[in-house]
């Protein structure tokens, strides 16, 4: 599963990838990320929402493919 996450994250636009990594890997809050990057907190939230939706969709698709192939 980590390989799938890494693949999806690597395909993200640079700013979204950076925000995701600062949040999930470095553990920074949305406020800290916004301050560090000089952007609005809402922008950080939007990027994280999109990133998590992309990861969720990729995981759902991989589970579906696995289930279809295992029948």
Model-predicted segments: where are they?
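Residues within the DNA-recognition helix of helix-turn-helix
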Residues: 4, 47-50
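Short linear motifs centered on Gly/Pro in flexible linkers and helix caps
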Residues: 2, 42-45
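Helix-turn-helix DNA-binding module
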Residues: 10, 14, 18, 26-43
